[in-house]
């Protein structure tokens, strides 16, 4: 398994190939449908957004509350296609990676290639297991969205699979 850390660099991303298994360490951000809509709307209106996207990763996840003594509750991946309408814009603003589950649209694949990004798969159905790789959690924005708010996660050795690499090659083909 390859070990990578955030922030992502173009050189690092270009070294990844569809199907590679990786262990990710560093900072990632959670965001689902409603957070993506708010980010997108703010960008379109020229407003400042609450997170710097450049070279960062968004995990499509809505974590549950943390049990006593844990950093986070269950935090499995959300179906990525739900974010497809917002993804090209976020990639154009410097977002470098996404974590989720399932296929992506052709428009997203083209944007991944254009902006030298990468799409990772998290293991679906393993939300409780994934939580063991998360060391710290901090609310960043949109508290009113509850689990769909944007959280900053500090992860160590999070196992992922490269689903779509920076050349647009997909494990689904």
Where are these regions (language model features)?
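Short, structured beta-strand/loop micro-motifs enriched in basic residues and often containing a Trp
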Residues: 1-8
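Feature captures the catalytic cores and cofactor-binding loops of soluble hydro-lyases/lyases
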Residues: 30-31, 35-158
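Active-site/ligand-binding-proximal alpha/beta "capping" segment
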Residues: 87, 161-173
């Amino acid at each position: 398994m390859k070990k990578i850390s955030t922030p992502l660099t173009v050189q690092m991303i270009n070294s990844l190939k569809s199907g590679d298994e990786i262990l990710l360490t560093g900072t990632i951000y959670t965001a689902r449908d409603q957070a993506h809509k708010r980010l997108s709307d703010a960008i379109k209106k020229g407003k400042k957004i609450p997170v710097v996207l450049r070279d960062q990763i968004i995990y499509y996840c809505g974590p549950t509350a943390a049990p006593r003594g844990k950093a986070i509750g269950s935090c499995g991946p959300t179906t990525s296609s739900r974010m497809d309408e917002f993804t090209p814009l976020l990639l154009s603003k410097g977002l470098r990676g996404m974590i989720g589950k399932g296929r992506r649209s052709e428009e997203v694949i083209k944007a991944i290639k254009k902006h030298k990004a990468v799409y990772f798969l998290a293991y679906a159905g393993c939300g409780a297991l994934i939580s063991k790789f998360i060391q710290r959690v901090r609310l960043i924005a949109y508290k009113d969205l509850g689990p769909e708010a944007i959280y900053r996660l500090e992860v160590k050795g999070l196992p992922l699979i490269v689903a779509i690499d920076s050349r647009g090659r997909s494990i689904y083909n």
